[in-house]
Design a protein with these regions (language model features):
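Hydrophobic N-terminal alpha-helices or hydrophobic patches in metabolic proteins across all domains
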Residues: 1-173
């Protein structure tokens, strides 16, 4: 079990380092945020919501409502739940085919949840602005982390593998 935890932390640190020093400074992450905002804008169009989507260069994308409410997509990407999920799945033992399928399916679900989180934040800011901070600071992050935990537990079942715990220090009677 300790080996799994060490692998998890090492993989997480590698992913965090790669994201912080290569992906984020290169501007590719902002393309992801722009794509997320564009999807939210399309969902708002499909729902018949009146809004204005503004792209302010590579650092900020905002969606405005008619009453002045707005959502900034910068910082709403949910990159840490992605990192935790990838590290957890990579650290737990299992076959590469199942692992690849789980990573693809899990990342797709996390992306969908991230888009719904931004959409939900917009709708709450428009219709229940008093509850916006509660949703943005507590409910949305808790929902994303809970999804990561459920996906990881699903992976532990699907993988069909268990880490080697070694010999138990407790002897049976």
């Amino acid at each position: 079990m300790q080996l799994v935890l060490i692998r998890f932390f090492l993989i997480f640190l590698l992913i965090w380092f790669f994201f912080s020093f290569f992906v984020s400074p290169s501007g590719h992450y902002f393309q992801y945020q722009e794509f997320t905002a564009e999807l939210v804008a399309k969902l708002l169009n499909a729902m018949g919501e009146d809004h204005l989507w503004l792209y302010h260069g590579e650092y900020k994308t905002e969606i405005y409502a008619r009453d002045g409410a707005h959502i900034s997509v910068a910082g709403s990407g949910g990159q840490y739940p992605y990192m935790f999920f990838i590290a957890a799945v990579m650290a737990w033992p299992g076959g590469w085919l199942r692992r690849s399928a789980m990573l693809i399916a899990g990342l797709a679900l996390l992306f969908s949840a991230s888009v719904l989180t931004v959409l939900g934040a917009y709708m709450i800011d428009v219709y229940h602005p008093v509850q916006f901070d509660l949703f943005k600071k507590y409910i949305a992050p808790t929902a994303l982390v809970s999804l990561v935990i459920v996906l990881f537990f699903t992976w532990t079942v699907i993988s069909g593998a268990k880490p080697d715990f070694g010999e138990s220090p407790v002897k049976p009677l």
